[in-house]
Amino acid sequence: MNPLDLIAKRAYPYETEKRDKTYLALNENPFPFPEDLVDEVFRRLNSDALRIYYDSPDEELIEKILSYLDTDFLSKNNVSVGNGADEIIYVMMLMFDRSVFFPPTYSCYRIFAKAVGAKFLEVPLTKDLRIPEVNVGEGDVVFIPNPNNPTGHVFEREEIERILKTGAFVALDEAYYEFHGESYVDFLKKYENLAVIRTFSKAFSLAAQRVGYVVASEKFIDAYNRVRLPFNVSYVSQMFAKVALDHREIFEERTKFIVEERERMKSALREMGYRITDSRGNFVFVFMEKEEKERLLEHLRTKNVAVRSFREGVRITIGKREENDMILRELEVFK
C-alpha cells in the first residue's frame, strides 16, 4: 500500500468548528491574555534573538517553572518543555512500546497513537469512572489525565499508585491542575516511572502559543530531550510563558472566577435534573443518551452555540458569566 494511503487510512486530523458562534467546546480560557502583559512580552524580546535557533528549553523559563512547582526535591534536570503538552504526549508515544489509556479520556491519545503507528490498548473506565484492573508493565506508557478529560473527575492517589507499582510508565496529564489545585507531582520522590505533564494553554490563556512542560526523573528528561525535536518551543512562546509566571497572581484570580462559575453551573444543572460529574476542570460534563444528546446539539446549533460531543454526553467549557448564563437558560428550556 502507498504510504500516503496508509496514513490516510489509520490517522485522522483534529478538526474544530468555525468560530462564528459562542464557542464552548475546547476548554479555552474565556479571558484574553492581558494587553499590558502582551506589551511587556514585546518590550522584553531581543530582536537579535529572533535570528538564532533559540535554546529550548530556556534556562530562565525552567527556573520559573521550578519556582511555580514550589518543591524542595526537583532541579532543572527534572524539567523540560514541549510545543504544547500535546508534543510531549506525542513524543512519549515514540519512546515506549505500547500506549495505554482509559476512555472516556483525552481524544488526542488515540489520534496520536494512530498517527505514529504506535501499539495501543484502550480499556474503558469502570461504570463509576475508576481506573480498571489492567495488565501493564515495563515498556508500556499509561496516560492518565487528572482531572480527567472529558469528565473532569479526579482519580484517587491509590489508583495512580496501583499503576505505578506495576512498573509501567505513567504519564500523568495535569493540564487542568490549576482548576483543581491538587497535584500528584510528589509521587516523583518515590517513583521514577512517572512524568507529570502540564500546559500554559488553560489557566494562563496561552493556547495559541503552544507551551507545555514535563516534570520527571533526570533519566526520563534526558531521554525525552534526545527524542524531541530541537528548538521545539519558540523564543517568543517561551517569553510569553515567562511573563505569565511573573504575573501568576492575575491568572490565579481568573482561575478563582472560573472555579466559582463551574460550581455555580454544577449546582444549577443538578437542580434542573441533569446527571453530571463532579468536575474539577474548567468545564462541566453532562451524561446523556445518544438520542437526547443529538437533540440538544441540534437545539444549541439553532442558538449558534458549540459544545463538545462525546459518546457518553456533552462537555461544556466554562465561559464568561454571560455565556454561562445563556447556556444554562438553553439547557433549562431544553429540559
UniProtKB/Swiss-Prot annotation:
Pathway: Amino-acid biosynthesis; L-histidine biosynthesis; L-histidine from 5-phospho-alpha-D-ribose 1-diphosphate: step 7/9. The modification N6-(pyridoxal phosphate)lysine is found at residue 202. The keyword Amino-acid biosynthesis applies. Its EC number is 2.6.1.9. GO terms for molecular function: histidinol-phosphate transaminase activity; protein homodimerization activity; pyridoxal phosphate binding. Its cofactor is pyridoxal 5'-phosphate. Keywords: Amino-acid biosynthesis, Aminotransferase, Histidine biosynthesis, Pyridoxal phosphate, Transferase. It comes from the Bacteria. One of its GO terms (biological process) is L-histidine biosynthetic process. The keyword Transferase applies. Homodimer. Belongs to the class-II pyridoxal-phosphate-dependent aminotransferase family. Histidinol-phosphate aminotransferase subfamily. PANTHER family: HISTIDINOL-PHOSPHATE AMINOTRANSFERASE, HISTIDINOL-PHOSPHATE AMINOTRANSFERASE 2. This is Histidinol-phosphate aminotransferase.
